[in-house]
């Protein structure tokens, strides 16, 4: 330690001497920078000296103390952290945003051109459209010309001379002197409260390099490698090294907001971060105090909040905008993407574990968001990387993609950076179908035979095919997913649950084996209803389990994860839906993952696997994917393997990413091909491919057994065959790949023959429904023979009647003019009304004779119609401006509800409930028109009754409040002395004591009867009161039971004061003042209670509180609410 201190001492004085020499020729600005650096070096020197003194004296610093000591040198030179200073740096001074940065843009372009000449294409394309970037290109050309003047043979490849190398070294030395020292972390930064792994340090250095070169980037490490920690460490670099404490905006999914805040507080506790969330009022308070008050370093918000609160967020000049799960902005037309493009920021960073999931255009959308000045034209980007036919061209394009993406994207996978994490073993388990599954599979195909055969001339709708696909996938999972498939009632949990689904048979064998081996299992499925079946199965087999799906509450979700990850947990199985449980969860206590079915998007399955296969996993993870052989699932798996092969070819080679510009996997042709796959086997075979025997419910028998070892061996060979098939495909094959290519060999197309073999068994025994549908051949020939005709109807349709909503209070005369105009339009176009027009105009009419009369009336109206006169046109325009067409039904219903809640005359309270959709003036105008024309509103009696009933409740509550006030004012100490003249009957076996009744009345008076949560507050007061500490009955009452007793007591008071209470204007004014006074007393009481809790023990505080409430508080409370000029009874 002494040696290290001596070395530090030597370097400190060496640095100090160099700074003094340098200052002789430096400007004031550069001197300030070096002065800060000098302070940092001095602080480090003093810190090392303090550590040496501690060790010499024998004292030991705690980890927290050591971190705080390590942090002190980094805090030197930070800007003052107070809201007023922050406002000068955080708030935008120019409403139009920042000006064009010629120097920064030139530096960025120069750096990219130094990496590859390919960027010149995009820069020139941008310069041709924008004169600002033409200026940048001119500066670059000028710099290039100046550089060429220094050497005569730069374009000739040869060895450098000593003179040239010396010149380059001198140039690098000058650049080091001109700028502050560039930090390259070789170990975990001291400002991070923990240790970073070596690859994470490399990631931080990469982010630092991007920042230095003014380039935004995509951190696309595989999930589980600590992207959040790397990002927080980089923000720490900006804060402590660059002295840029903010403002930073982190945008993340709602489920990970708290995790971001926890990680920031854990790794860099000095950073002031907060989450912008809550209801409208809570968000408004946060925005006013924290955001616009500039009392923050980092703001964390969800995608939805960004859209809702875009207006205040646009006022901040963000240093960095960081987007977690950045594939949310892959569509540049989405609302989130458009809103974010309106924000002003100096830099941007995208974080994602799945950089691209679909095509080239989505890659361009991400790059356009990061660097809009370079990647400005989507068409140009697509054309530049369009694939050619030859293999050489494919290799060239792959190399170009790597070169272009390399500066912006960092992607590492676990097997590369985490040597302690063993690679996961994946195996596709190919299972057959049970006899019940065969039956249902065949039934689904027969139900829509024309669509399955593809025999119609017109193409089937994509929705229809997707529906068939979904039903077939359900059948492959378990036939009990169909209503009516499970035998019963009575419904039993028996062996039939397992043996009616081949997948569950295999899973049953597999889980038994894994249980014996001591493994723990995660089971993922797309369908939450399948998890219901698996829950019954786990109960049947006595397997302890946890479950998470899309409907699981956040608290239950965390509890389930904690229970499963707890030491010595007995939970064997964790059931999860792929989308809800595949993101943001750490389940490394499991070592086996079972994918019960496959997702359309293979990245979702990879995310599911990574719940267990991530850093911290000590065992080798095994992944079993259940696939129904010769079914749609097999084709879905092939499609997923194709996508992942593309990822391996283009993304992993240089850790950059690209997805092909592919035909959609769910296109009609591809869907039809998937549906037809294996259909012939289903119709040819009447027996099961999985288990021929299906036991009856309740029999306790088992179906035919499965040899698991043999199945594993066969599945392993088939999995290898599938992977080998796609390993040989090149980039062009993958970009143009579709299912038809599998039928082409040696120049011949075998597709038609194979489709005949598939389809013909389906037509052998068509059902009656299919026989009727064969008449659709007429539709086919009609379409074929009329291909040249226009699909437009030969005559126009009659305009539909104008829809009038009675609550919008439009003038009734306007409807007459609209109808007259509609009839004239029909006459002018020569339209003859039909029965459809009768239904549209008069609704459903059951009487045929009446229908004919209405039709004749409609025809007569059309024949006798006349165009609107000029006066009628003017009246129509005037009447259209009247009414309240901007009030929709939802707002009208809310108006009715809050009018009853607050009373029809409480316009301000009603307007508060309807804000921000309606202003106070709009509500006042509508209320006036509503009560003046209420008879014009349909079912107005119903709405009037709702409001009047609610107003009666308000009036009754006020009467009860007044009766309660008068009763309490009769006694000096009502908690002990109050007596009811008409006490409630005590017929019940267990009733309330007089002391309990008095306490309920006192608490009702304290909080007010008009509060919705008054009985929840009364319950809390009872449980906090030491007088009832041993009264289990009273303490265990629910708010509903207390409300029942409270209403009974209030009715007794109403009897007592029934004749003496009149709610005149004077009484109402006094009660309003009392409410305000009571609110003030409650606030003071709450503040007093809070202070007491800080200074005394909890029990003494409660005693003081009840004594104050019972002896003094009530008397004072009643006295303050009684006017001085009113005498008590």
UniProtKB/Swiss-Prot annotation:
Biased amino acid composition, Basic and acidic residues: 1073-1108
Residue span(s) of domain Helicase ATP-binding: 208-373
SANT domain span: 882-935, 988-1052
Keywords: ATP-binding, Chromatin regulator, DNA-binding, Helicase, Hydrolase, Nucleotide-binding, Nucleus, Phosphoprotein, Repeat, Repressor, Transcription, Transcription regulation
Positions where Phosphothreonine occurs in the chain: 694
Reported effect, residue 227 to A: Abolishes ATPase activity
Entry EC number(s): 3.6.4.-
Residue span of motif DEAH box: 324-327
Annotated localization: Nucleus
Record GO cellular component, one term: chromatin
Class in the EC hierarchy, top level: hydrolase
SMART domains, alphabetized: DEXDc, HELICc, SANT
Feature: compositional bias, Acidic residues: 164-177
Function: Catalytic component of ISW1-type complexes, which act by remodeling the chromatin by catalyzing an ATP-dependent alteration in the structure of nucleosomal DNA. They are involved in coordinating transcriptional repression, activation and elongation phases. The ISW1A complex represses gene expression at initiation through specific positioning of a promoter proximal dinucleosome. The ISW1B complex acts within coding regions to control the amount of RNA polymerase II released into productive elongation and to coordinate elongation with termination and pre-mRNA processing.
Family label: Belongs to the SNF2/RAD54 helicase family. ISWI subfamily.
Protein name: ISWI chromatin-remodeling complex ATPase ISW1
Lineage: Eukaryota, Fungi, Dikarya, Ascomycota, Saccharomycotina
């Amino acid at each position: 330690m002494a040696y290290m201190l001596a070395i530090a001492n030597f370097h400190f004085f060496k640095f100090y001497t160099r700074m003094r020499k340098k200052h002789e020729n430096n400007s004031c600005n550069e001197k300030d920078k070096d002065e800060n650096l000098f302070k940092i070096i001095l602080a480090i020197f003093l810190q090392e000296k303090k550590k040496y003194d501690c060790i010499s004296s024998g004292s030991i610093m705690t980890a927290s103390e050591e971190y705080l000591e390590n942090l002190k040198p980094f805090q030197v030179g930070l800007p003052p952290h107070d809201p007023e200073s922050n406002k000068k740096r955080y708030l935008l001074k120019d409403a139009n945003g920042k000006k064009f940065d010629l120097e920064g843009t030139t530096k960025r372009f120069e750096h990219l051109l130094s990496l590859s000449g390919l960027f010149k294409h995009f820069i020139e394309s941008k310069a041709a459209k924008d004169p600002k970037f033409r200026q940048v290109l001119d500066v670059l050309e000028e710099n290039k010309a100046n550089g060429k003047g220094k050497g005569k043979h730069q374009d000739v490849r040869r060895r450098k001379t000593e003179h040239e190398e010396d010149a380059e070294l001198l140039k690098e030395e000058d650049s080091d002197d001109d700028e502050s020292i560039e930090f390259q972390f070789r170990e975990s930064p001291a400002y991070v409260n923990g240790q970073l792994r070596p690859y994470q340090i490399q990631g931080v250095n990469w982010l630092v390099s991007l920042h230095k070169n003014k380039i935004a980037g995509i951190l696309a490490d595989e999930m589980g490698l600590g992207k959040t920690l790397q990002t927080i460490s980089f923000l720490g670099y900006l804060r402590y090294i660059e002295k840029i404490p903010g403002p930073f905006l982190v945008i993340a999914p709602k489920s990970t907001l708290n995790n971001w805040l926890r990680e920031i507080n854990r790794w860099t506790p000095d950073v002031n971060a907060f989450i912008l969330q809550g209801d409208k009022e809570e968000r408004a308070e946060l925005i006013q105090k924290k955001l616009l008050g500039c009392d923050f370093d980092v703001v964390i918000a969800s995608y939805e909040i960004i859209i809702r609160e875009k207006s205040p967020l646009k006022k901040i000049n963000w240093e960095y905008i960081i987007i977690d799960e950045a594939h949310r902005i892959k569509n540049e037309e989405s609302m989130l993407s458009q809103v974010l493009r309106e924000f002003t920021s100096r830099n941007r960073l995208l974080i994602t574990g799945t950089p691209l999931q679909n095509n080239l255009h989505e890659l361009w959308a991400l790059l356009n968001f990061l660097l809009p000045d370079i990647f400005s034209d989507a068409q140009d980007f697509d054309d530049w990387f369009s694939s050619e036919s030859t293999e050489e061209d494919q290799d060239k394009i792959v190399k170009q993609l790597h070169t272009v993406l390399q500066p912006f994207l960092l992607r590492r996978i676990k097997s590369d950076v985490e040597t302690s994490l063993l690679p996961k073993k994946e195996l596709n388990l190919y299972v057959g179908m049970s006899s019940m599954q065969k039956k249902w599979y065949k039934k689904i195909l027969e139900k829509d035979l024309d669509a399955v055969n593809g025999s119609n001339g017109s193409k089937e709708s994509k929705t229809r095919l997707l529906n068939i696909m979904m039903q077939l996938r359900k059948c492959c999972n378990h036939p009990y997913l169909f209503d009516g498939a499970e035998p019963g009632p009575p419904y039993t949990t028996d062996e039939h649950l397992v043996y009616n689904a081949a997948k569950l048979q295999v899973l049953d064998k597999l889980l038994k084996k894994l249980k014996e081996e001591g493994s723990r299992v995660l089971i993922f499925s797309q369908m939450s209803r399948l998890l219901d079946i698996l829950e019954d199965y786990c109960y049947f087999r006595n397997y302890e389990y946890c479950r998470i799906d899309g409907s699981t509450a956040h608290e239950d979700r965390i509890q389930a994860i904690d229970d499963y990850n707890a030491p010595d947990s007995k939970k064997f199985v964790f059931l999860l839906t792929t989308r809800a449980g595949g993101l943001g969860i750490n389940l490394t206590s499991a070592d086996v993952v079972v994918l019960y079915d496959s997702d359309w998007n293979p990245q979702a399955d990879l995310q599911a696997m990574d719940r267990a296969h991530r850093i911290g996993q000590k065992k080798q993870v095994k992944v079993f994917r259940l696939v129904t052989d010769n079914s749609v699932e097999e084709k879905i798996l092939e499609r997923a393997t194709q996508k992942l092969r593309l990822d391996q070819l283009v993304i992993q080679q240089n850790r950059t990413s690209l997805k092909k510009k592919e035909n959609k996997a769910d296109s009609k042709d591809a869907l039809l091909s998937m549906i037809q796959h294996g259909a012939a086997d289903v119709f040819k075979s009447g027996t099961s491919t999985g288990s021929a025997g299906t036991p009856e419910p309740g029999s306790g028998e088992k179906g035919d057994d499965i040899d698991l070892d043999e199945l594993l061996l066969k599945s392993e060979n088939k999995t290898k065959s599938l992977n080998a098939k796609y390993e040989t495909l090149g980039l062009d094959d993958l970009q143009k790949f579709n299912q038809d290519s599998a039928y082409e060999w040696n120049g011949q197309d075998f597709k038609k023959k194979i489709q005949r073999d598939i389809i013909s068994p389906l037509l052998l025994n068509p059902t009656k429904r299919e026989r009727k549908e064969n008449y659709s051949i007429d539709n086919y020939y009609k379409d074929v023979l009329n291909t040249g005709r226009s699909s437009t109807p030969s005559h126009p349709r009659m305009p539909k009647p104008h829809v009038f909503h009675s609550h919008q209070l439009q003038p009734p005369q306007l409807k007459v003019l609209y109808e007259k105009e509609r009839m004239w339009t029909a006459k002018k176009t020569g339209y003859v009304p039909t029965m459809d027009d009768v239904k549209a105009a008069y609704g459903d009419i059951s009487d045929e004779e009446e229908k004919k009369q209405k039709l004749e009336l409609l025809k007569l109206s059309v024949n006798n119609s006349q165009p609107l006169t000029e006066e009628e046109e003017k009246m129509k325009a005037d009447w259209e401006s009247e009414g309240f067409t901007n009030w929709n039904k939802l707002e009208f219903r809310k108006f009715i509800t809050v009018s009853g809640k607050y009373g029809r005359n409480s316009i301000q309270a009603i307007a508060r409930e309807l804000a921000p959709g309606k202003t106070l003036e709009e509500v006042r105008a509508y209320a006036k028109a509503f009560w003046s024309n209420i008879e014009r509103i349909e079912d107005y009696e119903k709405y009037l009754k709702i409001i009047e009933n609610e107003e009666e409740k308000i009036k009754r509550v006020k009467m009860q409040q007044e009766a309660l006030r008068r009763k309490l004012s009769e006694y000096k100490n009502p908690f002990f002395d109050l007596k009811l003249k008409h006490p409630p009957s005590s017929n019940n076996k267990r009733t309330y004591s007089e002391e309990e009744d008095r306490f309920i009345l006192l608490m009702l008076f304290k909080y007010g009867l008009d509060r919705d949560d008054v009985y929840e507050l009364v319950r809390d007061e009872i449980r906090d009161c030491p007088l009832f500490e041993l009264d289990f009955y009273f303490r265990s009452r629910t708010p509903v039971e207390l409300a029942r007793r409270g209403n009974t007591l209030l009715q007794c008071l109403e009897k007592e004061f029934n004749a003496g209470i009149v709610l005149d204007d004077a009484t109402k004014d006094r009660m309003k003042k009392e409410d305000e006074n009571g609110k003030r007393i409650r606030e003071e009481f709450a503040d007093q209670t809070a202070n007491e809790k800080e200074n005394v023990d909890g029990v003494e505080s409660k005693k003081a509180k009840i004594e104050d409430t019972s002896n003094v508080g009530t008397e004072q409370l009643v006295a303050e609410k009684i006017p001085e000029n009113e005498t008590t009874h």
